[in-house]
Amino acid sequence: MSRVRPTKFAHVVYRTRRFKEMLRWYEAVFGAEVQYQNPVLAFLTYDDEHHRFAFANLSLIQPDGTEADRHGVIGVDHVAYTYASLRDLSDNYAYLKEKGITPYWCAHHGITVSMYYADPDGNQMEFQVDSYRSNEDANAFMYGPHFSANPIGVEYDPEDWLARLRGGTPEADLLLRQIHEPVSPVRGSLEE
């Protein structure tokens, strides 16, 4: 298996207890616009990408948390990198697995299919592929009821998807999230 590299930096996710203040700051500094917002999550962009920044409101996620809590620490939650195709993302999964590196969470967010990893220091990163061919379609999905009903996504089994892709299943059959699938719990640093 050969190494597969991401094609671009995608976004950064911040954990904050100053949710509204952070949104105003990023709107002012970057000219960012809110793509989607609910009381717990917000997604902003400053270009044609579906989102460049995401914010998790710790005041609601961990209302009793302190700065010393592992799950309630403000700051960077993860950085994300985009791969050219679902096949590349899955091949990279197989390559890393051969080296003993496996994701702690695989989620189909609707706008992206993602695998989350943690480095030896616990820094989290998301490797993703866009589910839509155009940013316009991804943005339309974010404004729609399907995303509003489930902005976290659904978990999937990377082994199953790898086997399906290698067995000839078209990427398009896996990229569009089905509305009936259950909402995934949040994994990683915000997990209880």
Locate each region found by the language model:
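Conserved short beta-strand elements that form part of the metal-binding/catalytic scaffold
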Residues: 33-73, 118, 124-132
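Short N-terminal helix-initiation segments at or just after the protein's N-terminus
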Residues: 15-27, 56-67, 162-163
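A detector for short, charged/polar N-terminal pre-domain segments
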Residues: 1-2, 164
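Histidine-centered active-site/metal-ligand motif
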Residues: 11, 50-53, 63, 78, ...
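N-terminal "first-domain core" detector
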Residues: 5-47
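Vicinal oxygen chelate
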Residues: 7, 15-21, 73-74, 79-124, ...
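Short, P/G- and charge-enriched loop/turn segments at secondary-structure junctions
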Residues: 1, 66-67, 103
